Amino acid sequence: MSADLTHNQPSVEAPPSGGASHFGEPAWAKLCSFATMLEDEGDMRGLLGPRELERLWSRHLLNSLAIEPDIPASASVADIGSGAGFPGIILAIVRSDLSICLIETMDRRVQWLEEVVKKLDLPHVQVFNMRAEELAGQAHFDVVTARAVAPLKKLIPWAFPLLKPAGALVALKGARAEIEIDEARKMIRKFSINSVTIHERSVWGTDEATRVVKAYAV
């Protein structure tokens, strides 16, 4: 009798219905293609844990869009620590008006991001294999984004040298957002940040609220 090899395999979360109507057919098709790539290769390539497939759409793909309303039209965006592509690739799929720079230090993740950009035909996206600190002084952006990269006290000194005057750091954060802000007071003063706010966001296709931290330069 052969063993059931699928018994311990995690299930893959199905996409919510109505995506084509909400995002438009082209963007929805790319989101689904990206999801399939992650289902097929995410665990094998060390991009997502196997159990993350059980909440791929709600926790990762759609959750990334909580920051989309905070990004102005035709903005330049730097995504620090893009990893598997959250939120940078997701933003690129739904916002073709943006110019997006994905910043990632790990070679295998850089290779993955380059493959995704090519396969999904995202000409408005560039991938940089470097640390954010190395890009400082070479380029400046309207918005810097980040998700699950570092606490704010570390993220702020990486992000603010990359921002244009009046630019904004927009970060996806969890329950510790207030604590992270308190712990980052020294960096907030150092970089003359005049506004740090927390926003609770509902995201289409999910039942969970997401917290977004926005910090503005003077």
Predicted regions and their residues:
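A short acidic, Gly/Pro-enriched loop at the edge of an enzyme's catalytic core
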Residues: E133-V143
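Conserved beta-strand signature within the Rossmann-like core of class I S-adenosyl-L-methionine
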Residues: A166-R176
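Active-site capping/gating segments
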Residues: R176-V218
